[in-house]
Amino acid sequence: MLENLSTEHRNEKTMNLDEMSIKEVLQSMNEEDRTVALAVENEIEQIEKVVQTVIKSFEEEGRLIYIGAGTSGRLGILDAVECPPTFGTDDKMVQGFIAGGLKAFTKAVEGAEDREELAEEDLKSIGLNEKDTVIGIAASGRTPYVIGGLKYANSVGASTASISCNKNAEISKYAKLNVEVETGAEILTGSTRLKAGTAQKLVLNMISTASMIGVGKVYKNLMVDVQSTNEKLIERSKRIIVEATGVSYEVAAEHYEKAERNVKAAIVMVLLQCEYGEALEKLKEAKGFVKKAL
């Protein structure tokens, strides 16, 4: 029942929200937002287990699939689409599905989140299998679309996890791993796009970033698999080579082009003073980890 969910309770501190000045509203929001990171901290051990599961999927050439409705679905898609430019993944490695399809990203599709079968159809469309990890996201922890997706994922042997913002969430019953970030009452009653949405974004950031580190997409704290899809990223790529190797900008730019704009290969070429082909071979042997290639 909705009334039993902490995310649906009224916030005692903001009972007179409509009478507050703009500054008071903003201060109240800021005060409440400060509690979110602490709530996430309480779930670090569970998030770690999820990351380990995702890394295992990636190592077996499986995928990470997010499913959610409304804000939760949009946040999953947002995290997924950032992975190719940031970590050089293909667009299949991390995917996001939202109840009602992509059109629901910009406009609500009424009733879609209440249909369990829609998630099963979405997951069947990509040939979900036992190598994949499915993460169901729902602030309330009770969204039928997410429950349906988790049920189907379990039926094909995929790994499953859930992210919710209430304790003892319904979706936790259908996932092998559960992250329950208790964010409590929102300043605007029931508006879970606020603290709950912020908490979900923080958790998704952790999962995707830590998982990519775990499969060699990062060297030191540099995103060495960045894709040079625009001028800003081309410039960033050269700067990453400078930071990783200590060479001048000119030398970095030269190796960047010699390595056919492969940042990892350019770094290995500079540090081992080798040719492009040898750098690629060393990276292949090291399964993409720059540190191991060196």
From Swiss-Prot:
Homodimer. It comes from the Bacteria. The active site is at residues 82, 113. Keywords: Carbohydrate metabolism, Lyase. A lyase-type mechanism (elimination/hydration) is suggested for the cleavage of the lactyl ether bond of MurNAc 6-phosphate, with the formation of an alpha,beta-unsaturated aldehyde intermediate with (E)-stereochemistry, followed by the syn addition of water to give product. Pathway: Amino-sugar metabolism; N-acetylmuramate degradation. Residues 54-217 form the SIS domain. Belongs to the GCKR-like family. MurNAc-6-P etherase subfamily. One of its GO terms (biological process) is N-acetylmuramic acid catabolic process. This is N-acetylmuramic acid 6-phosphate etherase. The keyword Lyase applies. It catalyses: N-acetyl-D-muramate 6-phosphate + H2O = N-acetyl-D-glucosamine 6-phosphate + (R)-lactate. Pfam families: GKRP_SIS_N. Its EC number is 4.2.1.126. Gene3D superfamilies: 1.10.8.1080, Glucose-6-phosphate isomerase like protein, domain 1. The keyword Cell wall biogenesis/degradation does not apply. It is an enzyme of class 4 (lyase). InterPro entries: Etherase_MurQ, Glucokinase_regulatory_CS, MURQ/GCKR, SIS_dom, SIS_dom_sf. HAMAP family: MurQ (MF_00068).
